[in-house]
Amino acid sequence: MRVLPQHRDIVQKLRQLMRELAPDTREVLTYGILAWRANRIVAVLSPTKKDITLAFSRGASFEDKYGLLQGVGKVSKNLKLKDVKEIKKTVVAYYVKQALAADAK
């Protein structure tokens, strides 16, 4: 997975948080992008020129009390991160917990 230098710290932080918040998932490369799998793909991390996208496979069904989920898809929703300072553990944990619950169904 190719990541621009200005986004590497974001990727590193998200990988660290996923290891901590979703220890039973496996980090895998799928179609050249980083993903976390439990029963199915739970989340996908994809770099763009502008930001890093953390997409949740069933994010459209999530509660979104922070109003941060984006995307027009009927199933997947994502967080767009441009700076490591935007990453708040409690916020990521809120969405990851829902992703794991959706995967367990």
Label for each model-derived stretch:
Residues 1-105:
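Charge-dense, helix-prone N-terminal extensions
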